[in-house]
From Swiss-Prot:
This is Urocanate hydratase. NCBIfam families: hutU, PRK05414.1. GO terms for cellular component: cytoplasm. The gene is hutU. It is found in: Cytoplasm. NAD(+) binds at residues 49-50, 127, 173-175, 193, 239-240, 260-264, 270-271, 319, 489.
Length: 552
């Protein structure tokens, strides 16, 4: 992959570079994904998650930008794995962009085949929000992480993580949310990363409090704050596959254990034990097969240590990076003895159509986001947990790139909020249109048996019709751009998922599209969980009037 040193930053203000606000939104969000404040390796078009890219290569990126600048408001741009392949006449209510990233026929859906295609320049890895142009930096996963640790606190520690120690690893674009999410819940956390730059970045953005290269210092500080029942987050430089076994050897057991290293990609995402970053990069280039094998062996040691901590009483869970699967394939037959975070903590929210709803101010003006915060505090005042989140986010979350906000809203709430935002754009309360989107990790948009759809009540973990139906209904209902991806979060062969974005530009046409899309999109989450037999989803569907033909 050619590296290009250029600083990409989304335009701000109300001057259009394109022929309409929907096209402008797509252009700005693509560029925002590659803003140095947002992207992990912008010179390689890598946004987050190992090699999750916004475009296939620089030639494709430039062609997408040119296409968006000339795209008419009754045309649709098609993007195939980060490359623009066609512009067709459609209509004004159709999506302006349709994206399909990293999709492979199941028999060939593995990393080896993907890498062959990638080397030939035929495919890219889109992760979830990298290739669908709606990544907003670490805030994008922060509330989900906050909710996860909050639910763990409610289930196991009396509602707060005060006086507890969490041990985790991985401080990249996704995992970087963990330190702040734990301290927001009152706890102490040691977060390990092998790359000093990742820790430095989280400290710079106020997601992590301190840095150390010493395990002794990390433990001393952690114990001191745990005793005082005060929160602190400690970024520890090192390899989790070395540090966790060492802690087991010393009989040190944290209260909570998880992991968000990029274990989904053994070649590009995980560093084997005994290698520096530089040595790992050299081996990766010279002998990728040996690298992958060493990586998998290290992951197995990592999971063995997590299981040992679980056996000693630590609340242990997989945070969706497929590390258990790798260890299982390497012969660790009890790798799945600790659960994934969705069945352990998040599924009830999915049953209510809740998920990581986000919005971005195309103006670039933080005041536009602060005004929308006030809408949440006013319109959803009865949801104290949500309002607390908004207040904390305002105080503690630093914007990356275009100002944005995330919060988990459910069926009915999303459409209500979208309507209000569109009205605020129409009457000039907000200085420019707002982009509304979400993660692919949502209630009805993903099939991922080792993550979002793990341990479904009816055994339908691997049924992948749901994300396809989600993308189809969002497209016909007028989402601004819609994406269908493979392999996000857990790697090739383990997930299919869909994304959508809708632009609130203040027009009446946008109001109608928003109403349709922000009803059907979370509605798919309710429907999917009704179909799987969840009582809470059935209650939600009946209460909200979701039309499900065979619901009992």
């Amino acid at each position: 992959m050619e590296k290009v040193k250029q600083t990409i930053r989304a335009p701000r203000g109300t001057e259009l570079q394109t022929k309409g606000w929907v096209q402008e939104a797509a252009l700005r969000m693509l560029m925002n994904n590659l803003d140095p404040e947002v992207a992990e390796k912008p010179e390689e078009l890598v946004v987050y998650g190992g090699i999750g890219r916004a475009a296939r290569n620089w030639e494709s990126y430039n062609a997408i930008v040119d296409s968006l600048k000339t795209l008419e408001s009754d045309e649709t741009l098609l993007v195939q794995s980060g490359k623009p392949v066609a512009i067709f006449k459609s209509h004004e209510d159709a999506p302006r962009v349709l994206l399909a990233n990293s999709n492979l026929v199941p028999k060939w859906a593995n990393w080896n085949h993907f890498r062959e295609l990638e080397k030939k320049g035929l495919m890219m890895y889109g992760q979830m929000t990298a290739g669908s142009w709606i990544y907003i930096g670490t805030q994008g996963i922060l509330q989900g992480t906050y909710e996860t640790f909050g639910e763990a606190a409610r289930q196991h520690f009396g509602g707060s993580l005060k006086g507890t120690l969490t041990l985790t690893a991985g401080l990249g674009g996704m995992g970087g949310a963990q330190p702040l999410a734990v301290t927001m819940n009152g706890g102490v956390v040691i977060a390990i990363d092998v790359d000093k730059r990742s820790i430095d970045r989280r400290i710079e953005k106020r997601y992590c409090d301190m840095y150390t290269e010493s395990l002794e210092e990390a433990l001393t500080v952690a114990n001191e704050y745990k005793e005082k029942k005060e929160p602190i987050s400690i970024g520890l430089l090192g390899n989790a596959a070395e540090i966790l076994p060492e802690l087991v050897k010393r009989n040190i057991t944290p209260d909570l254990v998880t992991d968000q290293t990029s274990a989904h990609d053994p070649l590009n995402g995980y560093i084997p034990v005994g290698y520096t970053l530089e040595e790992a990069a050299k081996l990766r280039e010279e002998d990728p097969e040996r690298y992958v094998q060493l990586s998998k062996e290290s992951m197995t040691k990592h999971v063995e240590a997590m299981l040992a901590m679980q056996a000693k009483g630590a609340i242990t869970f997989d945070y969706g990076n497929n590390i258990r699967q790798v260890a299982f394939d390497e012969g660790l037959k009890n790798a799945f003895d600790f659960p994934g975070f969705v069945p352990a903590f998040i599924r009830p929210l999915f049953c209510e159509g809740k998920g990581p709803f986000r919005w971005v101010a195309l103006s670039g003006d933080p005041e536009d986001i602060y005004k929308t915060d006030e809408v949440i505090l006013r319109e959803f005042a009865d949801n104290e947990h949500l309002c607390n989140w908004i207040r904390m986010a305002r105080q503690q979350v630093e914007f990356q790139g275009l100002p944005s906000r995330i919060c988990w809203l459910g069926y009915g709430e999303r459409a209500k909020f979208g309507r209000i935002i569109n009205e605020m754009v129409a009457n000039g309360e907000l200085s420019a249109p707002i982009v509304i989107g979400r993660d692919h990790l949502d209630c009805g948009s993903v099939a991922s048996p080792n993550r979002e759809t793990e341990a479904m009540k009816d055994g339908s973990d691997a049924v992948a019709d749901w994300p396809i139906l989600n993308a189809l209904i969002n497209s016909v209902n007028g989402a601004s751009w819609v994406s269908v991806h493979h392999g996000g979060g857990v790697g090739m062969g383990y997930s299919l998922h869909a994304g959508m974005v809708i632009v609130a530009d203040g027009t009446e046409a946008a109001a109608k599209r928003i109403e349709r899309v922000l009803t059907s999109d979370p509605g798919m989450g309710v429907v999917r969980h009704v179909d799987a037999g969840y009582d809470l989803a059935v209650e939600t569907a009946k209460e909200k009037g979701v039309n499900i033909p065979m619901m009992k």
